[in-house]
């Protein structure tokens, strides 16, 4: 049961990361050397 819970958390974090990376990639003012 704990393994299933960790797996679900990992998938959720993975999708959130994809969403954030997609949002940043669509930002025309994106600069790899700048952190906001």
Swiss-Prot record:
Location in the cell = Plastid, Chloroplast thylakoid membrane
Where does this protein chiefly localize?
plastid
Q: Which residues form a coiled coil?
A: none
Q: Does Membrane show up as a keyword for this record?
A: yes
Q: Name one GO cellular component term.
A: photosystem II reaction center
Which Gene Ontology BP terms does the record give? photosynthesis
> Where are the bilayer-spanning segments?
4-24
Q: Which Pfam families match?
A: PsbI (PF02532)
Q: Specify the domain of life of the species encoding this protein.
A: Eukaryota
User: How the protein assembles, per its UniProt entry?
Assistant: PSII is composed of 1 copy each of membrane proteins PsbA, PsbB, PsbC, PsbD, PsbE, PsbF, PsbH, PsbI, PsbJ, PsbK, PsbL, PsbM, PsbT, PsbX, PsbY, PsbZ, Psb30/Ycf12, at least 3 peripheral proteins of the oxygen-evolving complex and a large number of cofactors. It forms dimeric complexes.
The task this protein performs is described as: One of the components of the core complex of photosystem II (PSII), required for its stability and/or assembly. PSII is a light-driven water:plastoquinone oxidoreductase that uses light energy to abstract electrons from H(2)O, generating O(2) and a proton gradient subsequently used for ATP formation. It consists of a core antenna complex that captures photons, and an electron transfer chain that converts photonic excitation into a charge separation.
Q: Please give the name of this protein.
A: Photosystem II reaction center protein I
Instruction: Tell me the organism.
Output: Pinus thunbergii
């Amino acid at each position: 049961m704990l393994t299933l819970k960790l797996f679900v958390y990992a998938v959720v974090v993975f999708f959130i990361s994809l969403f954030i990376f997609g949002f940043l990639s669509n930002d025309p003012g994106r600069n790899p050397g700048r952190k906001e």
